[in-house]
Structure formats: structure tokens, C-alpha cells
Amino acid sequence: MSDYIASALSRDEHFRIFAADATQTVREAQRRHDTWSASSAALGRALVATALLAASGLKNADDMLTVRIKGDGPVGALVTDGTNVGTVRGYVEEPHVNLPLNLVGKIDVARAVGKRGLLAVTKDIGVGDPFTGQVPLVSGELAEDFTYYLAKSEQIPAAVGLSVFVNADNTIQVAGGFMLQALPGANDAELSELEANVKTLPLVSELLKSGLTPKQIIQRIAGDEPVQFLDAQPLKFACNCSKEHFGDIMATLPHAQLQEMIDQDGGAETTCKFCGNQYHYTVADLEALMTRHE
């Protein structure tokens, strides 16, 4: 089944709930970057959170949301992009990180990411300069960190759940997440009731493994609160890189540097950090780029 994000609005329009099955998306990221278990879990959670934030906070097809996470853990930096049309991409600085399981027998994402560092979210909506909100990491588990970001940077009371189940061979069994947001008009009693539902909710990975859909996960979170489901949004890993794009960047290099690539290397090759695609430039390609300086 293809990945998608389900969304719903409470009947009184006091809450929004989003839930995603991102299994295929995270599998594609793992395949492209050859990530090991701890790196897979961290990158997968970041991708799911980015998809949920983009679905809730972007309005136009050209809008872009970028998440940067830099903790003091061994996976290093995490960088992810999301769009309003359900595409995400991203990479982890150190893809080959395995760690012992934590005290509850799960992948130790908090140790992998680190508990000291920053989480930054940049929104580019095509009007004025992009806006960046930044908060310190509070746990490194990422779900709590994104919850804190929404509360402190966007002033939105929220609850976020993120989960990636990695098999022993480093493949991804399931991945997904949810995001509950309070809207203007919500009162503390309503929020407490839904937060209680969230606290008793099993891990999203367990719900997905048991066969629940994103819509059913939303219903579990809503409990007795009636909700109106909105249009579902397909979700996939996709990158907008191209040989032409990287060529445009290379064309800005000094003439002498391009000539050195021709004389010493007989061409050039570049790799996209976000997706791992490689692009080769022949001598003829480089000579064509050099003509842009003339």
C-alpha cells in the first residue's frame, strides 16, 4: 500500500490531527543512503515529522519546509525537506551508526541524536525571506523535540508521535507518526482528554504492524471526540535534484578550476546529499559550462 497522510478536524474545530504511514518513504531513504539501524530510526523519524509539519503548515505547491537537527550524538546532522504536495527528502550525516538497544529494548534514538543541540525549522513560502524557528533539543527522541518546537516557536500546544521499526537486517518494517494540534478556542479540559488518549496509545509502529491505518490511528487519538476527515495526501520520498541544477552550480566556479577538472580528472562527478543520485560531467559538459564565463 502506498504511503499517505490522513488528517481530521474536530467537530468544534478546536483540534487538528494528522497521522502518516511512511513505511515506503523511509524504506526508500534507507535504501538510498544505506543507513544502519540507529541512523535509519533517526532519519526516519525526522522525515515523518517533516512530512507532518509540511502537511499542516504549508499552503502552496511551491512552498518548502526544511528541518535541520544537530545534536551531539554519533549520527551527526539530520537535514530534511518537505513540500505541500507530499514529498520529502533528507539525509543523515553519519549513515552507518548502530547502537545497543536502550533500557526498554528499543533503538536508542536519543543517544544517536544526542540530547544537546538544536532543532531548526525553516519555512519558505515564496513571500519575503524564509522564516526560521529554532529551539534547543529537549530529549533527542525527536517526537518530544518537535512537540517542544511547536509550543515554543509556533505557540501551538501539540503532541507528536514518531516511530520507525528497523529489522535485524537494517531494512524498515514500518514507519509512521501522528501530530495533534490545538487550535484557537480549545480549552484545557479538551486538551487534557486528548493528551490522555495519546499517553495510552501504543507506539505508531506497533499500531501499523497490527494493521491499523492512519485514519484509524486518528480515531484512536480522538476517542469520543467526533472528527471530520479531510482529503488524504499521498506521501513519498522524492528529490528535485538534476544534472542541470548541479551544472548551474558548477558553472559559477572559477574558469581555472573547471579547466583543472578537464586536464587532471577528465571530467567530474557530483553526488546529491539528499538522495544519493550521482551525476557525471564529461569533458564536453565541462567545456560547455566554461563558455558561460565568456
UniProtKB/Swiss-Prot annotation:
Described function: Redox regulated molecular chaperone. Protects both thermally unfolding and oxidatively damaged proteins from irreversible aggregation. Plays an important role in the bacterial defense system toward oxidative stress.
InterPro entries for the chain: Heat_shock_Hsp33, Heat_shock_Hsp33_C, Heat_shock_Hsp33_N
Cellular component terms per the entry's GO annotation: cytoplasm
Disulfide partners: C239-C241, C272-C275
Name assigned to this protein: 33 kDa chaperonin
GO molecular function: protein folding chaperone; unfolded protein binding
Keywords in alphabetical order: Chaperone, Cytoplasm, Disulfide bond, Redox-active center, Zinc
Keyword tRNA-binding found: no
Name of the gene: hslO
Species of the source: Lacticaseibacillus paracasei (strain ATCC 334 / BCRC 17002 / CCUG 31169 / CIP 107868 / KCTC 3260 / NRRL B-441)
Keyword match Magnesium: no
PTM (free text): Under oxidizing conditions two disulfide bonds are formed involving the reactive cysteines. Under reducing conditions zinc is bound to the reactive cysteines and the protein is inactive.
Family membership: Belongs to the HSP33 family.
Compartments in which it is found: Cytoplasm
